[in-house]
Amino acid sequence: DYEEYIDAKKNIFKYQNENDIVVLNYDNEITRACAKEAKGKVIFFSDKEKLDNGYIIDEDIIKICTDKIRKHLLNVNDVILRGKHNYENIATALAATSTLVDIDKAIEVIKNFKPVAHRLEFVRELNGVKWYNDSASSSPTRTLAGINAFKEPIVLIAGGYDKNLDYKPIAKPILEKVSTLILMGQTSGKIFDCVKEEMENVIK
């Protein structure tokens, strides 16, 4: 069950000592509470709270804040990766390696790091339009993460094999962020039913 899953994850820091580091998501109530059980140094990251000590994702800027330093580390617009989840991963990586590598070198690596294939993978830019391949996002939850990764207007190609999932959760984000929706495959009808009352630019 979920409690067993949480306990299993705690094994990551269960056998640490005071010289070790554990990086935790401050915005998640469960991971925040894990700090009480950590034996090593706890470093938090957050994209919601202005932490006095930790790594902050503030709009487009990743910052470090400690008792001794407050510094802008990276503008997320300078990296190839897109999406809130990736920016959280970047903050985590910077925190985890903060005592091991030169942070400027780490930032250079991050700026040039390319995502794995089919996961918000940048394909090309043509006539001012940037094309991304996110075909690995085969569930509504992952499609939602992909949609939320962009501030620009989106032309979304969606659909595919029907896994009998609920597509209602992505209706509102599609209506808010997608200018044109192109549907295909077995799930095209289900997705269309979620947006047909309010969306005009749909191609089936």
Q: Could you describe each region identified by the protein language model?
A:
Residues L73-T180:
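Nucleotide phosphate-binding/pyrophosphate-handling subdomain across enzymes
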Residues I170-K204:
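C-terminal helical cap/extension that packs against the catalytic core
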Residues D1, R32-D78, V116-R119, V123:
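Extended acidic/charged loop-beta regions that coordinate divalent cations
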Residues N17, K39, K151, L175-V178, ...:
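Residue-level detector of structured alpha->beta connecting loops
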Residues V22-Y26, I157-A158, K177-Q186:
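Short internal beta-strands
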Residues T31-A35, A106, G146, I170, ...:
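Hydrophobic packing residues within well-ordered alpha-helices of enzyme cores
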